[in-house]
Amino acid sequence: MKATELRDKSAQQLNEQLLELLRDQFNLRMQKATGQLGQSHLLSQVKRDIARVKTVLSQQAGK
């Protein structure tokens, strides 16, 4: 996911995307805790995506 793609979305779409990413992060953390997570890079990838969405939301709120 690119920041330029996110800037084209509305605040409502970004909030929906943020909720989805937070759910994904929770599920990945649970998989890691139970030893079922095979692709550990997904945790950091989702974490960065959450940060991107939050950054774009705060930039849009500042305008």
From Swiss-Prot:
Entry's Gene Ontology BP terms: translation
Highest taxon above the source species: Bacteria
CDD domains documented for this protein: Ribosomal_L29_HIP
GO cellular component, one term: cytosolic large ribosomal subunit
Keyword Ribonucleoprotein tagged: yes
Keyword annotations from UniProtKB, A to Z: Ribonucleoprotein, Ribosomal protein
MF-aspect GO terms: structural constituent of ribosome
PANTHER family (UniProt xref): 60S RIBOSOMAL PROTEIN L35/50S RIBOSOMAL PROTEIN L29, LARGE RIBOSOMAL SUBUNIT PROTEIN UL29C
Family to which this protein belongs: Belongs to the universal ribosomal protein uL29 family.
Protein name: Large ribosomal subunit protein uL29
Name of the gene this protein is made from: rpmC
